[in-house]
Amino acid sequence: MCAQPYRYRNMKLYTETKILLKSIPATVVTLFTVSVVCMNLLANKTLVQLDWIALDGGILISWLSFMCMDMITKHFGARASTIISIHAAVINLLTCLIFFVASAIPSRANDYTAFDSIFGGTWFVLLGSTVAFLISAVINNFSNHAIGKCFASNPDGKLAYAMRTYVSTFIGQFLDNFIFSVIVFVFFAPIFWDGFCWTVLQCATCALTGAVAELIMEILFSPIGYRITKRWKRENVGQEYFAFTERMSAQ
């Protein structure tokens, strides 16, 4: 008796995800997924490390991930954006697995130590980036949606889009940076990286500085995201997905 509802929910989620992936323009899904994978690779490099601040390479691309999530949340909803976030995280894990296998295969053709070190990665960096991304994505998506409800009189206006993207991005980026930094550089790095570590203060300042830097990028590029979502609405993008969700909610 319990297995049938569970199987039904799984089929419903599978169908919803399949329709959603067909509904969101492929360019946005591709950019989003690639940015998530790149964040994982770039996070292996510390760009700046001072007593009060530390920044890793993920800051260079993470703003794009959040901009894509904000666009999807605005047009398709927080649930849809979260589904796509999980999809991107799974692709990231599969990519990292391929990199790991490639780096683990011995080769005498040349010295691939640098390649193996970069693309082989470490399991705790993958763990930190995946956990941090999923938590921050959920909070970003649903806070974005909640803030949008405060502008019921003009939900599609520039002010509404700006406020929901700026606030949710800052919150999400701070949590993403902080959770990742604590997991990787406070807990695991001292054990596996010969004593190298960040302090909690460095993690907090990294998270704050990174959130501010990525917020600036969001401010610079949000007009593009706003125009894209306006075009999506004008061209009725995603009607199949909206029809599906309406049918499911009516059952």
Stretch-by-stretch model annotation:
Residues S81-H87, K158-V167:
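Membrane-interface alpha-helices at helix entry/exit sites of multi-pass transporters
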Residues L55-L60, L127-I135, V167, I171, ...:
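Hydrophobic alpha-helical transmembrane segments of multi-pass membrane proteins
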Residues V36-L41, F66, D70, N92, ...:
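Transmembrane alpha-helical segments of multi-pass membrane transport proteins and ion-pumping complexes
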Residues M11-A89, L93-L94:
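Hydrophobic transmembrane alpha-helices
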Residues F100-A109, V182-F192:
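Membrane-helix interface motif
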